[in-house]
């Protein structure tokens, strides 16, 4: 019997199933979304933890186009036994990925946005057949990249057209919603990007009468940017949330089954040491990118860390003070440290506040909470509760990355070398004490 292929880099759900790659069944994510019925859901998880593949799965499940063909993709999955299969193929779906918006100027970014929106409009060209001339002209001007005025409301406009055509409300999927904003900060056009995406997102998700559900993925929880201001129906699910914890990354039993299938179950101990250790909600999670690459290479090494460079994190380290490096030393020594994690932040404030760096380390997958439960403290003078978590490095892969990349890179700059050496010396003294 031919074995299924190892799915390295496969993010299209249809291809995953039809071309018989090994697929870890995450289809009950669909049922949980339908049970919870949040109008708009934001999932934040680290890079390469299955966000795009899950979004692709949602597209193929809900999409009203090709619904009979798409139904076959789910025949052998857990969701096929759910009563919520009656929701399959019922809705028009707009799927927009923003993870490749990497332009170095705002002018180039706008061109990339136009290209992305144009591609989506071309996908639905058939709905123009029943439009009046005014609507058809508006549609075609956006499709042909000639309409700048309606660009920031183009997703809302498309959902209105789809609702009118099908008579069913629309599901909007936005993958890597924060990628263009982070890239804008790194390249000096943050204000222009924020002004655009505030309207782009809020028009599609907040004031949209044609919306059934909106689902977004990203890495950061940048609630305070104003992008989601007034969006009372937004549910934010992070690595700290209890719900949906099992759907991004791999559970222990899923990894065991994979290693057994590929006949290397005896390697489970070293796999656990290198790639386990993430605590999402109350679940222990393995890094899926590292697991599939390990299955291919049969060698323990840093797979995820070596391809998940984070320019924003590096910029933050460039601006960081001595206390950050002292804590980095403690983390590499295997300590867990209690840190405050805010409910939301602005991307721009990350560069100006050393305390914010730990939030980005956590959400980006370089740190995880320890198994100890949340410690909740009341700050009565401010009149609100804050969350503090015991954070730690999750596994040997990330510890090797801290040692070889985050710390060693600063020996290339004179200023940071002094800070780092001082921090390491102080850390050693504390250990001796």
Task: For each feature predicted by the language model, list its residue ranges.
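Phosphate-binding site recognition
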Residues: 1-433
